[in-house]
């Protein structure tokens, strides 16, 4: 892999690290970036690459929130952290709808992976973010901490995650919207979304790897490792930024950004015909 191609892969890793956690759709951005960069690797590999580099992003969540996610304590009397185990059970419950939909993943991708759908979902969920923020303005959230999330609420958030199977939706965007609709604060909605990403994105990456196979060329191995490492580093920065940002600000800016990006995607591919 030459230096220019390596720079392209690094740029894709940067885009993944930023857009995976901000509710602005990594798919929509990667579609635009790939349109201009044209990485010199097979189409099938790039389809798999765009999903598998999420492993780097997942690792960032594990590293940043390890103390909160690790269910065991050094204390002899309280070796098992019950609250953490309960949180993981709720995450498993939230994963159930997605697991049920696994057989339909490829069909949905084949049916909806096009610029028109991506532009539409970018704009639609951008509008939803603005509407929800306007609705919640001045109200105290009913769910102010992770332990307030019930099993029923976790399952409902998982249903919203199914919507992210449609390209352009944004997995984080869909689950944050779902959590906020059920009364979660912005911080809790984002935090639960990040934790839910661990099994969800790991599973999606594993499925893509199994579908593609584990036979890679030297250039493809370099691309995967570089992309994952870049996504990991950028994700660390972005997650820290977002969690600090939403303590004092709302999601409206991301809603407006989605609307503008959706219009750009629609306009570009309409003119490119």
UniProtKB/Swiss-Prot annotation:
A single GO molecular function term of this UniProt record: undecaprenyl-diphosphatase activity
Record's catalysed reaction(s): di-trans,octa-cis-undecaprenyl diphosphate + H2O = di-trans,octa-cis-undecaprenyl phosphate + phosphate + H(+)
Main location: membrane
Transmembrane segments: 4-24, 45-65, 84-104, 112-132, 149-169, 187-207, 219-239, 251-271
Entry's localization field: Cell membrane
Keyword Cell wall biogenesis/degradation: yes
Topology of the protein relative to the lipid bilayer: Multi-pass membrane protein
Gene Ontology cellular-component annotations: plasma membrane
EC number: 3.6.1.27
Domain of life: Bacteria
Keyword line: Antibiotic resistance, Cell membrane, Cell shape, Cell wall biogenesis/degradation, Hydrolase, Membrane, Peptidoglycan synthesis, Transmembrane, Transmembrane helix
GO biological process terms held by the UniProt record: cell wall organization; peptidoglycan biosynthetic process; regulation of cell shape; response to antibiotic
One matching Pfam family: BacA
Purpose of the protein: Catalyzes the dephosphorylation of undecaprenyl diphosphate (UPP). Confers resistance to bacitracin.
Family: Belongs to the UppP family.
Miscellaneous section: Bacitracin is thought to be involved in the inhibition of peptidoglycan synthesis by sequestering undecaprenyl diphosphate, thereby reducing the pool of lipid carrier available.
Descriptive protein name: Undecaprenyl-diphosphatase
Biological source species: Lachnoclostridium phytofermentans (strain ATCC 700394 / DSM 18823 / ISDg)
Lineage: Bacteria, Bacillati, Bacillota, Clostridia, Lachnospirales
């Amino acid at each position: 892999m030459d230096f220019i191609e390596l720079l392209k892969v690094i740029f894709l890793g940067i885009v993944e690290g930023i857009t995976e956690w901000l509710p602005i759709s990594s798919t929509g951005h990667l579609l635009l970036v790939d349109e201009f960069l044209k990485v010199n690797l097979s189409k099938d590999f790039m389809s798999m690459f765009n999903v598998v580099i999420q492993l780097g992003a997942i690792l960032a969540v594990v590293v940043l929130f390890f103390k909160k996610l690790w269910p065991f304590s050094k204390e002899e009397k309280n070796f098992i952290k019950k609250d953490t185990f309960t949180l993981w059970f709720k995450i498993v419950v939230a994963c159930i709808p997605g697991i049920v939909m696994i057989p339909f993943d490829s069909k949905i991708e084949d049916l909806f992976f096009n610029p028109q759908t991506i532009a539409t979902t970018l704009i639609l969920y951008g509008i939803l973010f603005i509407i929800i923020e306007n609705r919640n303005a001045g109200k105290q959230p009913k769910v102010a901490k992770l332990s307030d999330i019930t099993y029923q609420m976790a399952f409902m958030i998982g249903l919203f995650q199914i919507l992210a199977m449609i390209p352009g939706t944004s997995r984080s965007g869909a689950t944050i919207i779902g959590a906020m609709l059920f009364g979660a604060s912005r911080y809790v909605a984002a935090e639960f979304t990040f934790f839910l990403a661990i099994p969800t994105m790991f599973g999606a990456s594993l499925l893509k790897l199994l579908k593609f196979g584990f036979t890679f060329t030297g250039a493809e191995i370099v691309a995967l490792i570089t992309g994952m490492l870049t996504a990991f580093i950028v994700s660390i920065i972005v997650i820290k930024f977002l969690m600090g940002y939403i303590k004092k600000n709302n999601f409206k800016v991301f809603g407006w950004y989605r609307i503008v990006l959706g219009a750009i995607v629609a306009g570009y591919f309409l003119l490119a015909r």
